[in-house]
Regions:
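Secretory targeting and sorting signals
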Residues: 1-29
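Beta-strand-centric surfaces of beta-sandwich/beta-rich domains
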Residues: 33-231, 236-318
Length: 318
């Protein structure tokens, strides 16, 4: 069954836009020494900030299915800095003592999305979902990090306000209290860093991100008419179980591949364990008016009506 959250989310975001935010999400300091390294030399030279959003107590599973916190919206949540560039995002789900919350312990990070309230979203700015602001980072249970090439970063300004959408599941019969943890590598705003604009590509664009697939191999498309021309430097993808890969191609250049993000699945194929990422300076140069096509490819033994096909790209505007 498709998730119906558009109306409450739209009402909440409209309210936030009118009153300029709401109460911040609770964020606690991480345990001593809890700082995840990144693979980028640029990120290594930056300072590290860890923010934990929560706590979230997920109800226990019942005979009807897993316990769930379903698309909980929080307004004006904590940022890692007031005036900086973010060089990398590393997501996780943890318990209060800092240990990882995983499927093995019953907890699942179905997804979370961060949005910057007063910035225009590149692909849904004219839609009701644009009230959420610019979607600039997200993760599913695969917990893919976004690390930018040296000299690039996502700008944070003192007047920005962030929103957070969280969806969590609990497969165990007992409640689980968890935190969404994000490790940020940051640089000061006065440093020489080239700014990035996030672009959200989605098969079910500007809706709930879910769509249906048949049994067997399927390749579902969504086309973006480029309105953020420039250098694409980083891309990452998100799929559900039985997902094979998600790819962005430039159809105006004969289908040239920009990024092919490949899924690594669990042994039963039901769970995505990781997604490959693409990074380059640049991966590609895109021009205004070109057509970038999103391909979401599944190989499922049965039909499904709740899969996703998403890529998040970061562009240095021309």
């Amino acid at each position: 069954m498709r998730k119906v959250w558009a109306l409450p989310l739209g009402v909440a975001l409209l309210t936030s836009a009118l009153v300029a935010g709401g109460p911040p999400a609770e964020a606690s300091a991480p345990p001593a020494g809890e700082e995840a390294p990144t693979s980028s030399a640029e990120a290594a030279a930056a300072s590290t900030r860890v923010v934990r959003y929560g706590p979230y107590t997920i109800p226990g599973a019942t005979s009807n299915g897993p316990g769930r916190i379903h698309n909980k919206l929080q307004l004006a949540v904590q940022r890692p800095c007031l005036d900086c560039y973010i060089m990398s995002f590393t997501p996780d789900l943890v318990y209060g003592d800092g240990t990882r919350a995983t499927m093995a312990t019953g907890a699942m990070l179905h997804h979370f999305v961060l949005g910057s309230q007063f910035r225009r979203d590149a692909t849904c700015g004219n839609d009701w979902l644009g009230l959420f602001g610019e979607r600039f980072f997200a993760s599913g249970d695969e917990r893919t990090a976004a690390t930018f090439p040296s000299g690039y970063g996502y700008r944070v300004r003192w007047y920005d306000s962030w929103n957070l959408l969280v969806d969590l599941m609990n497969m165990s019969p007992s409640p689980r209290t968890v935190y969404v943890k994000v490790t940020f590598a940051v640089r000061s705003s006065w440093e020489s860093v080239r700014p990035l604009k996030p672009v959200w590509l989605d098969v079910d664009q500007c809706r709930d991100s879910e769509y249906s697939i048949p049994a067997g191999v399927s390749d579902t498309h969504w086309d973006w008419t480029v309105n953020v021309p420039g250098k694409v430097v980083t891309m990452l993808g998100h799929l559900h179980g039985h997902g094979v890969r998600v790819e962005a191609t430039n159809e105006s250049l004969g289908g040239a591949s920009i990024c092919n993000s490949v899924a690594t699945l669990s042994s039963d194929q039901h769970h995505v364990e990781s997604m490959s990422t693409c990074r380059g300076d640049p991966l590609a140069v895109i021009q205004a008016g070109q057509t970038v096509r999103l391909h979401s490819i599944y190989n499922s033994p049965h039909p499904a009506d709740d899969v996703m096909g998403i890529m998040l790209g970061y562009v240095h505007p021309a």
